[in-house]
Structure formats: structure tokens, C-alpha cells
Curated annotation (Swiss-Prot):
Forms a complex composed of PxpA, PxpB and PxpC. Belongs to the LamB/PxpA family. GO terms for molecular function: 5-oxoprolinase (ATP-hydrolyzing) activity; ATP binding. Keywords: ATP-binding, Hydrolase, Nucleotide-binding. It comes from the Bacteria. This is 5-oxoprolinase subunit A 1. It is an enzyme of class 3 (hydrolase). Catalyzes the cleavage of 5-oxoproline to form L-glutamate coupled to the hydrolysis of ATP to ADP and inorganic phosphate. Its EC number is 3.5.2.9.
């Protein structure tokens, strides 16, 4: 049977977190630098452990004002220290509740820049390796972060997005531009199935692009996020695709 990991970014102030955890297999928990705080980290961790969901850290640039979406050009050593700090904080909270971290997925601008900026990607990968080399790294499919993680001997999962538009080079269409978000649920469902079953995605230009899908991100924000997540989960099941972490 084909299997895929479904992940969601949580602990960011949305009301859907507990319900989404019943639908996904991996949770990326905000570490306080773009959203969340120690209380949301503890609560989201407790919910994830209760559901048996794999837990990951979701570090970002220090940018609460713009939800971690502001591009920053910081020295690699500063990024290394910041990522290490955020992973360590969440790991302590998870361990105190009897769990353990399984992966790290950067957030927002840090994620997108690391997909194309090798020094930044290496700084993130080094932080993960130096904290715990057994942790996996989630990065944009085909991006520099995936390559950097593997170069350092880490497990890397190539991530795709159910509801984001793609450019012909496999990168995500920038937020705020036409085609960045797939508003039509059927289109997003079709895109997800194509990525998981056929390992390809159709770009906004109509070009089919090869893509490796090892984990699919479902966004938890938005009025219809929970209903859409249920549809994705149901459709995968009806197609004989199992949902599990480590798939």
C-alpha cells in the first residue's frame, strides 16, 4: 500500500489545532519566534502526544510582527544559534511530557530562503545535527535544505504543499501573487494526488514538473482549513493511500 506523511504547522494561534491533530501524522510546533509561547508549546505537545502524532520543531527568524514571513539576511552563525535555541526549548517541553522530537521544519521566510540559499541551509542543518543527529529535516522538495541535511548525514523529507501553487522550477509561487494559493478544493485534491501517486505537479504555467513527495503540508489557518483537511484525508483513504509518519 502507498503511504504518505501529512503534516501541519501548529501552535500558531489557530483554533483548529486539536481537531487537526486527529487528521495528520506529523505536527510542526511553533517555537515562539514567529508565533506561540511556552503555554501553546506545552498544550500543543500534550494534544499531539495524546493523538500519537509525531512532533517536530518549527523554528523561524525572529519576526513576530510579520509572522516569520519577512526575509532576513543574518550571518549563518546567528541562524545556527537561533535554530538551536528554538529546537532545544521545544525539546525540553516534549521530554518533560514523556515524548521526544522527531523532526525539524523551518517556518516561513526561513524555510523559503533555505530552499535556495546554501549557506543558510547548511546553518540550519548543522544546528539540527549538533542538537540530535537522529532528527529528520523537512524541506521543500528538491531544495537546498534537503541537500544540506543529507550531506551532513541527516534524514531529510522532501515536502510538498496541498494548497500552494508551483513555479516551473519546482519552487512555490510567492504569497500575494496570482496562483500562490489554490482556493478551489478540487484543484488542491487533484494536485495532492498527482504529487503523491505520480510524483509530479502542474505549475501555474501548465508545465508538469517532477517532484518527490515524502510529506504533505496541510495549512491549519483559514475558515475552511479543517474541512479541507478532512477531505484530503478521506480522499487519500479512498485511493488506498495510508497516512503515517515515517512513510
Amino acid at each position: 500500500m502507498t503511504a504518505i506523511d501529512l503534516n501541519a504547522d501548529l501552535g500558531e494561534g489557530c483554533d483548529n489545532d486539536e481537531a487537526l491533530l486527529a487528521l495528520v501524522s506529523s505536527a510542526n510546533i511553533a517555537c515562539g519566534w514567529h508565533a506561540g509561547d511556552v503555554n501553546t508549546m506545552r498544550q500543543t505537545t500534550a494534544w499531539a502526544l495524546r493523538q500519537g502524532v509525531s512532533i517536530g520543531a518549527h523554528p523561524s527568524f525572529p519576526d513576530r510582527e510579520n509572522f516569520g514571513r519577512t526575509e532576513m539576511h543574518l550571518p549563518p552563525d546567528e541562524v545556527y544559534a537561533g535554530v538551536l535555541f528554538q529546537i532545544g526549548g521545544l525539546s525540553a517541553i516534549v521530554r518533560a511530557q514523556g515524548g521526544r522530537l522527531a523532526h525539524v521544519k523551518p517556518h516561513g521566510a526561513l524555510y523559503n530562503q533555505a530552499a535556495r540559499d546554501r549557506p543558510l541551509a547548511m546553518a540550519i542543518a548543522r544546528a539540527v545535527r549538533d542538537f540530535d543527529a537522529s532528527l529528520a529535516v523537512f524541506g521543500l522538495a528538491g531544495g537546498e535544505l534537503v541537500l544540506a541535511a543529507r550531506e551532513l548525514g541527516l534524514a531529510a523529507k522532501e515536502e510538498v504543499f496541498a494548497d500552494r501553487g508551483y513555479n516551473a522550477d519546482g519552487t512555490l509561487v510567492k504569497r500575494g501573487t496570482p496562483g500562490a494559493l489554490l482556493e478551489n478544493e478540487e484543484a488542491a485534491l487533484s494536485q495532492t494526488l498527482a504529487m503523491v501517486r505520480e510524483q509530479r505537479v502542474q505549475s501555474v504555467d501548465g508545465v508538469w514538473v517532477p517532484i518527490r513527495a515524502q510529506t504533505v503540508c496541510l495549512h491549519g489557518d483559514g475558515a475552511h482549513a479543517l474541512a479541507f483537511a478532512r477531505r484530503i484525508r478521506d480522499r487519500l483513504g479512498s485511493e488506498g493511500i495510508a497516512v503515517r509518519a515515517g512513510a
